[in-house]
């Protein structure tokens, strides 16, 4: 059966996450339903990252096996037609080898978290950023973030119910970009690693927000990391500011 890689964009707001749910809308379920309108199923697709409820994606990657050969451009267009009016889009499709696996072939995942500091409620970015009503110290947050880059035991920064076999991960990059606007300052956290633990990004950003607000010192981030205790973590920030922006492979399937 020919295998296809799909690059996917979605607004996570209306969905109970990526993974198929028995009684709730999911991104996986929406795409599998669209595939079923192209070819008789059942269809099961696998993704590089199983995003949680409310988490968005601009560069999710999944793969599917189909019964016949499709022109990748036409496949993407046909799926998009059947996905309407849901906020899900197949940005690109590519024919790949049977050895390609969206999850297990991935060597890098990239996330963005958008944090907006302003007193007034967000309007145009509602559901797409985490808003806090107080100013933040970007340099303090960068200093705190520096403690987390590299290979560490991230027990403190993973969900209590995380099912990963090991809490040890290598965070390859964690950078902070500030965007000054007329109506507030947006802080954009960019994170890159081969893989992440459940709630790792939201735990890190929630903790760094406390540093930016002055409630924590940058060195307390290191102390929390060294504690290897979930109770030492700062607040876990809400999901709506989180985006899966890209997945890396040894060879780009969409090139």
Curated annotation (Swiss-Prot):
First-tier enzyme category under EC: isomerase
Organism superkingdom: Bacteria
Biological process per Gene Ontology, one example term: tRNA pseudouridine synthesis
GO molecular function: RNA binding; tRNA pseudouridine(38-40) synthase activity
Classification via Gene3D superfamilies: Pseudouridine synthase I, catalytic domain, C-terminal subdomain, Pseudouridine synthase I, catalytic domain, N-terminal subdomain
Residues annotated as catalytic: 52 (nucleophile)
EC id: 5.4.99.12
CDD domains in alphabetical order: PseudoU_synth_EcTruA
Pfam families recorded: PseudoU_synth_1 (PF01416)
Keywords in alphabetical order: Isomerase, tRNA processing
Residue sites binding substrate per the record: 111
Reaction it catalyzes: uridine(38/39/40) in tRNA = pseudouridine(38/39/40) in tRNA
Protein role: Formation of pseudouridine at positions 38, 39 and 40 in the anticodon stem and loop of transfer RNAs.
Record note on quaternary structure: Homodimer.
Family classification: Belongs to the tRNA pseudouridine synthase TruA family.
Database matches in HAMAP family: TruA
Protein name: tRNA pseudouridine synthase A
Biological source species: Cereibacter sphaeroides (strain KD131 / KCTC 12085)
Protein's gene: truA
């Amino acid at each position: 059966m020919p295998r296809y890689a799909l690059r996917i964009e979605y607004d996570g707001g209306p969905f109970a996450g990526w993974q198929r749910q028995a009684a709730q809308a999911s991104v996986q379920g929406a795409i599998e339903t669209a595939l079923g309108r192209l070819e008789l199923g059942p269809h099961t697709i696998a993704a590089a990252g199983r995003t949680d409820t409310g988490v968005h994606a601009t560069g999710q990657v999944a793969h599917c096996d189909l019964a016949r050969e499709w022109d990748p451009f036409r496949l993407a267009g046909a799926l998009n037609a059947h996905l309407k009016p849901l906020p899900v889009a197949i940005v690109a499709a590519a024919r790949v080898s049977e050895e390609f696996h969206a999850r297990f072939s991935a060597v890098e995942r990239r996330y963005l978290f958008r944090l907006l500091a302003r007193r007034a409620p967000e309007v145009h970015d509602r559901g797409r950023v985490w808003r806090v009503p107080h100013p933040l110290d970007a340099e303090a947050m960068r200093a705190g973030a520096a403690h987390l880059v590299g290979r560490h035991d991230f027990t403190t920064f993973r969900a209590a119910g995380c099912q990963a076999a090991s809490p040890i991960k290598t965070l390859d990059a964690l950078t902070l970009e500030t965007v000054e606007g007329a109506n507030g300052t947006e802080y954009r956290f960019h994170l890159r690693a081969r893989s992440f633990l459940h709630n790792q990004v939201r735990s890190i950003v929630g903790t760094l927000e406390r540093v930016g607000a002055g409630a924590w010192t940058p060195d307390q981030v290191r102390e929390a990391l060294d504690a290897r205790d979930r109770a030492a973590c700062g607040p876990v920030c809400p999901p709506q500011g989180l985006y899966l922006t890209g997945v890396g492979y040894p060879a780009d399937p969409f090139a």
